[in-house]
């Protein structure tokens, strides 16, 4: 279908449309489409409607990988009738996918009704608006995310209640999947504010990376084409199926488990040093981490 500025609209097997990046040779939200993936991976898994409904004050969502705005807009749509205050903080190194998407609203129907605030977001990197009963503040940071997180200014970002993590794959974008990045991300969380972060990958390497960064980690919900994904959180009770010691034993035998310490994609088994750190983590020393004490992963 149509192609401009390095992107094109593609029709998925289920009839939904999405954006394809020619430079990365990857499609945003492939197979089940933008809205279905956002609802399965983020909205339902994070129980966002219930959490926002019960929340007093401003509910903060970090949107890591704005792309064509499907994840953030889906969150706004499902919570717009709750009479709440919500702040979206989006991050990306480019606005080109969103600019392209807004030229193709006829194919990307999830954007309908949000053209005006998204136009302001493009122009001013901020939009404030009323969405049904909801008061929305939407901020955008145009920057290299790994570099941004390492700067002192990142400490001033509003602390999130939920994180939508949706970067291109580690093979195409390794800088977004390193252990130092997730360690910096975890450092920015408020330890007293429950926060969970799902992502589409189920790789052993990612799960080890998140654990060593400080997160509790569990099996995430399936998204149609994937039987499971991954969810990380700063509090164990936010995870319904935490990884257990049976998983830990499988990791020890894996040929692709060592985190990426630098932004260079490769696969390697655990080093002895990483194994020692991993097996002594709190998640595997508590009741949920012992054989037979948690959900089967």
Where are these regions (language model features)?
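A short SAM/SAH-binding and catalytic strip from SAM-dependent methyltransferases
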Residues: 160-176
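SAM/dcSAM-binding transferase cores
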Residues: 5-10, 106, 131-134, 151, ...
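Rossmann-like AdoMet
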Residues: 1-59, 74-110, 117, 134-136
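S-adenosyl-L-methionine
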Residues: 100-157
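A short glycine-rich, Lys/Arg-flanked "PGG" loop and its adjoining helix->strand segment in the class I
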Residues: 175-194
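Glycine-rich SAM-binding Motif I of class I
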Residues: 68-73
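Conserved beta-strand signature within the Rossmann-like core of class I S-adenosyl-L-methionine
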Residues: 162-164, 191-201
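Conserved Class I S-adenosyl-L-methionine
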Residues: 186, 207-233
């Amino acid at each position: 279908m149509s192609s401009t500025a390095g992107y094109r609209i593609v029709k998925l097997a289920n009839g939904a449309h999405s954006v394809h990046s020619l430079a990365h040779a990857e499609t945003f939200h492939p197979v089940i489409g933008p809205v279905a993936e956002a609802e399965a991976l983020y909205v339902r898994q994070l129980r966002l409607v219930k959490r926002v409904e019960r929340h007093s004050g401003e509910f903060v969502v970090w949107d890591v990988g704005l792309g064509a705005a499907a994840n953030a807009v889906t969150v706004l749509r499902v919570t717009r009738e709750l009479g709440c205050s919500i702040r979206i903080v989006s991050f990306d190194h480019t606005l080109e996918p969103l600019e392209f998407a807004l030229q193709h609203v006829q194919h990307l129907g999830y954007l309908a009704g949000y053209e005006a605030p998204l136009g302001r977001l493009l122009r001013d990197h901020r939009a404030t608006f009323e969405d049904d009963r909801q008061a929305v503040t939407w901020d955008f940071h145009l920057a290299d995310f790994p570099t941004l997180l390492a700067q002192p200014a990142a400490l001033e970002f509003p602390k999130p209640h939920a994180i939508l993590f949706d970067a291109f794959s580690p093979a195409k974008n390794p800088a977004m999947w390193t252990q130092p990045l997730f360690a910096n991300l975890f450092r920015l969380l408020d330890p007293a504010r429950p926060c969970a972060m799902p992502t589409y990958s189920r790789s052993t390497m990612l799960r080890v990376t998140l654990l060593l960064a400080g997160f509790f980690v569990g099996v995430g919900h399936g998204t149609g084409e994937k039987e499971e994904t991954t969810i990380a959180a700063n509090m164990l009770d936010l995870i319904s199926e935490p990884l257990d010691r049976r998983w830990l034993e499988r990791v020890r035998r894996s040929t692709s488990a060592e985190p990426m310490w630098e932004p260079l994609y490769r696969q390697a088994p655990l080093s002895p040093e990483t194994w020692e750190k991993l097996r002594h983590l709190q998640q595997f020393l508590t009741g949920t981490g012992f054989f037979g004490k948690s959900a089967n992963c």
